[in-house]
Amino acid sequence: MHFASGIIRPPFEAGCAFLQVTSGCSHNRCAFCTYYKDARFAVSPMEEVEADLDELAAHPWRGYDRVWLQGADSFVLPYDRLMEIAELIHAKLPWVRSIGAFARVTNFCNKSVEQLRNLRDVGYARLTVGVETGDSALLARMHKGHDA
């Protein structure tokens, strides 16, 4: 398995299989976050993603039905790439029913409503979004890169 850093996920995702599709953070400017300050954002090559899925498929443990995409904001990936990843997951791990990931609020702005519905339909569900505040002035002070 290819992991650029340790496993980062919400506590309730502990029972998932983990698949790195990005590393680092595409924004990496939030005033309060130091976790990715020394890490450059990178997208995992599809060859690595596929090799990791092959490794998961070969493992005898099947006690999960969800895959968690590793990376600070894996949902930043373009729609076509997310669809390709979902297709590979379902082809190699047919027992998997859903896919989770961290997402920034801005990750939803570069996808149409139809694309978001399609992503939901192929299993993307319960994405974890960092919504620290609904106050635009505070978002600017925290360098979040979006407003309320």
Residue ranges and their predicted role:
Residues 41-51, 108-114, 146-148:
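Glycine-rich anion/phosphate-binding loops
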Residues 57-146:
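Conserved SAM/AdoMet-binding glycine-rich loop
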